[in-house]
Amino acid sequence: IGSGLVGSEMCIRDRIRSGDGRTNKYDVEAGNNTYDNAVIENSKISGKNKIQNNQSMLDDIMNSTQYPKQLKDLALKNEEALEFVYDYPAEHVKEHTIDLTEEASMDSVPLFVQWDKRWGYEKYSGNFFAASGCGPTTLSMVVVYLTHNREASPIAVAKYSKEAGYSVDGSGSSWTLISEGCRHYGVKAKTVALDESRMKAELDEGHPIVVNVGPGDFTDTGHFMVITGYDDEGFSINDPNSIEKSGKRWLFRNISSQIRAVWSMYV
């Protein structure tokens, strides 16, 4: 593993950011102001339409009796989960197939989100999994990466968490789901000091790092996430509650005060 990467997550994300990974000729040809202006204008229109569409969906959710209060709260708190909530009436009654074959064969830590329709409508810890399932989702990402176990989906880990007593009603998951529950899946965890150099050393060994964070950039309460690598711009994080935040880099000095616990995960 080179350049502080667990697998090749950084490269994958760079390709995602640039679309299909190819360079458009307009990206390298200078002086095409007409094209550039058109792109900017279309971007503005697209952004405006998205805002209007999101507001329309939110209004429909809030004015309907088809949505449980917990999902309405989620829609208000997390714009990324808005479409997931909006689709609840039609989707929550379906049986969703979960096939993690592709993710289990990846050479990078897969990103799973709590509000995936395949598992987000299930209940966990007194709430919808979409709102309370960061612990099982985080452990699932680590287990699937380290062991290639395609059966260890977020909702499968949630079921185990409940049976083993790691689910805390109204509060999500206990920290021991990570530090002890991982053994159920053949994964080990060791506590690591909140030190940038030490954490980078673990990542260099190919060990993804699970952190629990308090109020700040990622949560108002408590939250589990996976640190997957680092580069000159900062740490890369798989946030099970945000695809957008998972696509950014995070400087240690900006997140260290929010981190409450650190575990290095390995087999």
Outline where the language-model segments fall.
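Non-catalytic propeptide/linker segments at domain boundaries
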Residues: N42-L111
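Conserved active-site-adjacent core of cysteine acyl-enzyme catalytic domains
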Residues: R17-N53, D59-M62, D99-L100, V144, ...
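Single conserved hydrophobic/aromatic residue that forms the stacking wall/gate
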Residues: I1-G7, I12-D14
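Short glycine/serine/threonine-biased micro-segments
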Residues: G2-L5, A131, V168, I227
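Active-site nucleophile-adjacent alpha helix/oxyanion-hole segment immediately C-terminal to the catalytic cysteine
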Residues: S105-Y160
